[in-house]
A protein has these predicted regions:
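Class I SAM-dependent methyltransferase Rossmann-like catalytic core
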Residues: 1-38
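Conserved class I S-adenosyl-L-methionine
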Residues: 37-49
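Conserved SAM-binding loop of SAM-dependent methyltransferases across substrates and taxa
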Residues: 47-60
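Conserved SAM/SAH-binding beta-strand->alpha-helix loop
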Residues: 69
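S-adenosyl-L-methionine
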Residues: 79-108
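A short glycine-rich, Lys/Arg-flanked "PGG" loop and its adjoining helix->strand segment in the class I
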Residues: 106-108, 128-149
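A short SAM/SAH-binding and catalytic strip from SAM-dependent methyltransferases
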Residues: 111-130
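Charged, low-complexity C-terminal accessory regions
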Residues: 158-247
Length: 247
């Protein structure tokens, strides 16, 4: 299965809506606190909008989506198109890469706030090396310095005890992005770890080696960061981070 999309991914998302409800509720609660200044929204990595509440999207006058997955645009319209039409929200869906030509995409949408929808944590799977993935993430965040933007993304993921990841009582916590994070050891050496991981891993009984998605320092210092548990599969969980950067 393609980690970043594909028909099997959408089938899994549709099939596991009940199990993912806690994570979706956590994202909704985060977005309820976000009050974008812009009336336009650019969603990069939109997929079918499985975890973004349509009521929040209805607050915009125009929404533009990008995703490399050819199924994303038609399924996004299928899931959200009717209600967005009811709120008179203009919807434009594009199939293609918006990250490589990010500066050009931003210039084409000068008034839009930007939401990276569960894509930054996937870049480690799309680059030949971890160093190249980390460099791409850093380049993306530099491009956003003059733009209102937010992201929900994988921070870490890994195996959990049977039955723990299926709980709807998803772990939720809010913190502030520090200047730096303390180091710990994973399968590829010293990386950064937020202190909230200790509480998260205890609640979900994390097991084995967890994967670092290279996103620990995505947000500028002082950004409120929401930590959300995502029970991706019965024995595998993701720790999501969500934050919004205002101008």
């Amino acid at each position: 299965m393609n980690r970043t999309g594909g028909l099997l991914w959408h089938w899994r998302a549709w099939q596991r809506q009940a199990e993912w409800k806690g994570a979706c509720d956590g994202i909704s609660q985060w977005l309820d606190q976000v009050q974008p200044a812009s009336q336009e929204l650019l969603i990069i990595g939109a997929s079918a909008g499985w975890m973004v509440p349509v009521r929040w999207l209805q607050g915009f006058e125009k929404i533009t989506t990008f995703d490399i997955d050819r199924w994303a645009a038609p399924l996004f319209r299928w899931r959200h198109g009717r209600l967005l039409q009811a709120s008179k929200t203009q919807l434009l869906c594009h199939t293609g890469d918006a990250l490589t030509p990010l500066d050009a995409v931003l210039r084409a949408n000068p008034k839009a706030a930007v939401l990276f929808d569960n894509i930054l944590g996937q870049l480690r799977f799309q680059q030949p090396s971890l160093a190249q993935a980390a460099a791409q993430i850093e380049k993306i965040t530099r491009s956003m310095r003059t733009r209102e933007w937010g992201s929900v993304h994988d921070a870490y993921s890994g195996p959990v005890s049977p039955g723990k990841s299926a709980s709807r009582a998803a772990y939720g916590h809010q913190s502030v992005q520090p200047a730096y994070l303390s180091a710990f050891e994973t399968d590829h050496g010293a990386v950064s770890l937020a202190p909230e991981f200790t509480e998260f891993s205890a609640q979900f009984k994390a097991q084995g080696v967890w994967l670092d998605h290279l996103t620990s320092n995505v947000f500028p210092r002082g950004t409120p960061v929401h930590h959300i548990a995502w029970p991706y599969a019965p024995r595998y969980s993701h720790w999501l981070q969500a934050g919004w950067v205002a101008l």
